[in-house]
Design a protein with these regions (language model features):
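Alpha-helical scaffold domains
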Residues: 1-194
Length: 194
């Protein structure tokens, strides 16, 4: 893995293969062992495994509280994918309280794992039929102190505007563009709206 410098497909493919061909207890040990590596690519592999195991509460908690502290941005990208894996496997509507909990977390990487992981939100079951539920959750972070999170919020809203331009337009029309934070999100979110 350490020779892979771009992308994550190889780590994802290997993690899925190992998950499918071993019992969960072995995979859990493998995931923690990989995550303890000094090599970010190996940690990425471990986080993919965590995503497959995330119906276990201790794994989901570890993702939220520990993986979110990893200082490598690539590992954070995989955390977003792992969170989406959890939501997909459990059911998006069923995990709304957990989505909300992560969106309110003190760690910006945890909040971003949701906003980025569930992109394109309205392509996901439940949110496809309930786009306002996605919009409501995302816009709650429009003034987030983290620029990293705000960019993800703006991009997520822009994605939604492709399918639901009127909903996003109506939402943006209610914003008071008085801070640089809101203006940053507005600029990203309104990019495709006439």
């Amino acid at each position: 893995f350490s020779l892979i410098e771009n992308g994550f497909k190889e780590e994802e493919k290997r993690a899925l293969s190992d998950y499918r061909s071993n019992d969960k207890e072995f995979v859990k040990k493998l995931a923690f062992s990989a995550y303890n590596s000094n090599t970010y690519q190996v940690r990425m592999y471990g986080v993919f495994l965590f995503g497959y195991l995330s119906e276990q509460n201790d794994i989901l908690t570890f993702m939220r509280d520990e993986v979110s502290k990893d200082d490598n941005w690539r590992v954070q990208e995989v955390l977003a994918k792992a969170f989406d894996e959890f939501c997909k496997n459990t059911g998006y509507e069923k995990v709304l309280p957990i989505i909300d909990e992560w969106l309110e977390n003190d760690n910006p990487n945890t909040r971003r794992a949701v906003t980025e992981g569930l992109r394109i939100w309205t392509s996901r079951p439940y949110f496809k039929d309930n786009p306002n539920e996605a919009i409501r959750r995302i816009v709650a972070l429009k003034e987030d102190p983290s620029e990293y999170v705000r960019k993800s919020v703006g991009n997520a809203l822009r994605d939604i505007s492709k399918k639901f331009p009127e909903l996003i337009k109506d939402e943006l029309n209610n914003w008071k563009l008085e801070s640089k934070e809101i203006n940053q999100v507005y600029k990203l979110a309104s990019k495709l709206i006439n």
